[in-house]
Amino acid sequence: MGSDKRVSRSERSGRYGSAFDRDDRDDRDSRSRRRDSEYKRYRDERNDQYDDYRDYESPERERMRDRERRNSDRSEDGYHSDGDYMDHDYRQDYYMDEKESKTIMLRGLPININENDIRELVESFEGPQPADVRLMKRKTGLSRGFAFVEFYHLQDATRWMEANQKKLVIQGKTIAMHYSNPRPKFEDWLCNKCGLYNFRRRLKCFRCGAAKAESDMEAPSGSSETPQSADYYSDSGYVSSAIILRNIGPHTVVDSILSALAPYVSLVVSNIRLIKDKQTQQNRGFAFVQLPSALEASQLLQILQTLHPPLKIDGKTIGVDFAKSARKDLVLPDGHRVSAFSVASTAIAAAQWSATQPAQQSGEAGDYAYLQQGQEGNSNFGQCSQDYQPFYQTQTAAVDQDTAPQSEGSPVPATTSAVVCQSPQMYQQPGSPTQSGTSTAASTTPASTTSTEEATTPTAIVPGVKYSVPDTSTYQYDESSGYYYDPQTGLYYDPNSQYYYNSLTQQYLYWDGEKQTYLPAADGTGQSGAQPNGANPGTSKEGKEKKEKPKSKTAQQIAKDMERWAKSLNKQKENFKNSFQPLSSRDEERKESAAADAGFALFEKKQGALFERQFLPDMMMMMVNTEEEKPPNAKYRDRAAERREKYGIPEPPEPKRKRFDPTVVNYEQPTKDGIDNSNIGNKMLQAMGWKEGSGLGRKSQGITAPIQAQVRMRGAGLGAKGSSYGVNTSDSYKDAVKKAMFARFSEME
């Protein structure tokens, strides 16, 4: 036993070998894992470093670029995001001649450089100034090593490249410059039948099922690339009435933009929209300038783009271009694209421009078109403009005819025509405000034309014929009657009751918004005294006799009659509609009538002061008369006694019932007296063979009586044995006292 040597822990060997072998194997595994991770990290860093020079022709990279291009977002002004610059081919190809472009790429930039450094360096050189500088960044915010410099014109870019010999020194490092040209790419194709964009791999339209070959045959080759290649600036032929100003400073205000554009165009604050960030409340770098027409916008754009030096606002060079709409473009049969929104705005702008031109330029205004026929891609719009030329000429002729001086109260005429280019339909408000102005001036001007005489002559209103919605802004106030005269229909309008009076038929009418017509009011409510003065176009003697009457008396009579009319007709109108109209039509009528009567309500608020001034003396006299008629000594009126006489004395209230206290159940001892045999547990045990009085278990060895806690025996002192008188913990104080008294009595015996 003494010769046996105990084996140490280090020398043990068993099923899994010695401990040294296991430690060595673990160290080798950890070192190999560490080496693999370091190699993987080094490979990732190397790939990121040379990410810009990868093979961009591989199918995997092509799919990734397509995915990024689809997911890339565009800003509100249509300017390209950073992902869209991947469409440019910035690979080095020494075997191909570079194609000149107005976009120049700076390659090999330091990582810590930013856009401001590049912009300051480029602007410090003499010669053409750039329109925009864009530094490409990663998601982490670091530079990718290249940037794009955009010029207004191709000549400026080529001259700048020749002046700097295609090299630029930034932070002591020579940077190579190259022309950036977009590579031909295959995009999503547009169906010419339904106008839906389809994925480029889809052979049939997703909506209508038209074949892709049909769209390719109708659209000439290269039509899909034409808009995309010129997406940056106005070389694509896109025309709009709005201009975008880029490279706006973060703290530039609207007044600075107005002062900078003041030498070239006259603008107001409402013509400029400065886009700001919602969080920082600073400018986002661009603003929009809205001009009356596309012609003025193109002229201003041409002036600003040819400025040398370029336009600067708060020390920043401003880039100018047409503002593009965010709507989908439409493809014409000849392959050119144009926005549907610009078509509608084109016709409206042309109509407004032609109506506001002076008489000597009427010929030019009639021939004006928003998109000229000679421009490329706008041949169809020339035909559209010819369809609307008769409408423009009629508008211009109306302006020429209305040469009579207008009254001070007549509103300024405004063209509110709307044109839809899908079908050459014209929508015009009947009864322009210019007629009202000429009718007013006809009474004072000795020589008046036939058109003004027709405007002043009221036309007979035919019930059931649809008319245009009444425009209260064109009504003229008649001092003799105190009402407003409608020169279009020849009716007199009362803003208080919103009823019309026809002087030809001596009939009262009201406007029905659902039927779009004037309906006669009910008869038999006293129309004779409600006829306004000057309404009947009779002889001059009758007019003079009516004018000689006191105005206050006439106005007072008319006010009383119209109030009486309003009350009776409103009741009849409500009863008639409620009895014959279904529930569904009532809801629609409420909406339409609310829209139709909105102008009347606003007009009534505006003209309320005129009626108050006119009827104020009469109302004061009426109030004085009513006060005089009141009894001098007003006695106290016991309304409670009158109520008792009329309805009798009410019965006294019933006496309140006495409240009975509910029986109190001692919730602490619910089973003190035991439970009966009707409970579920007892029934289940009896079903299994248990009988009352026997214990539980296989051999009925369980207890039959409930377990009760015994109270500690109380002793009188040391060594003295106490007594137990059978008091339980569940006993009350009275029961315990009774048991104690009984135990003492038994011990004494």
Swiss-Prot record:
Domain of life: Eukaryota
GO cellular component, one term: spliceosomal complex
Record domain RRM: where: 102-182, 241-325
Positions with biased composition (Low complexity): 429-460
Molecular function GO terms recorded: mRNA binding; RNA binding; zinc ion binding
Pfam families: G-patch (PF01585), OCRE (PF17780), RRM_1 (PF00076), Zn_ribbon_RanBP (PF00641)
GO biological process, one term: positive regulation of apoptotic process
Basic and acidic residues bias locations: 585-594, 627-648
Keyword Metal-binding among record annotations: yes
Cell division recorded as keyword: no
G-patch domain residues: 677-723
Listed transmembrane segments: none
Functional description taken from the UniProt entry: Component of the spliceosome A complex. Regulates alternative splicing of a number of mRNAs. May modulate splice site pairing after recruitment of the U1 and U2 snRNPs to the 5' and 3' splice sites of the intron.
Complexes and interactors: Component of the spliceosome A complex (also known as the prespliceosome). Appears to dissociate from the spliceosome upon formation of the spliceosome B complex (also known as the precatalytic spliceosome), in which the heterotrimeric U4/U6.U5 snRNPs are bound.
Protein name: RNA-binding protein 5-B
Gene assigned in the entry: rbm5-b
